[in-house]
Amino acid sequence: MAKEAPAKTGLAVGLNKGHKTTARVVKPRVSRTKGHLSKRTAFVREVVKEVAGLAPYERRVIELLRNSKDKRARKLAKKRLGTFGRAKRKVDELQRVIAESRRAH
């Protein structure tokens, strides 16, 4: 992005010539918010997950994790989700679910 320009001097000559002005505070563009999760969306997803429970493949992944078959669990998640990054995130999330269920009991 452009650097902050030094303040104008109010003179007609020199590097910073021109009228003294106050800088406007510009709101960030809407296009900058793309991909950012809103509070409402996060809340709705949380409620849906709580009501609907886990998908069948998620239950299977949890079963594999409980039997310490981490690599197989990641491969299954990758097959269902498409990319390895998403699969790793999902497996980490499901491991947290297992840990929470252990703490609850």
UniProtKB/Swiss-Prot annotation:
GO molecular function, one term: structural constituent of ribosome
Region (Disordered): 1-20
Gene Ontology cellular-component annotations: ribonucleoprotein complex; ribosome
Superkingdom, taxonomy of origin: Eukaryota
BP-aspect Gene Ontology terms: translation
Alphabetic keyword roster: Ribonucleoprotein, Ribosomal protein
Keyword Flavoprotein: no
PANTHER family hit by this protein: 60S RIBOSOMAL PROTEIN L36 (PTHR10114)
Record family assignment: Belongs to the eukaryotic ribosomal protein eL36 family.
Protein name: Large ribosomal subunit protein eL36
Species annotation: Trichoderma hamatum
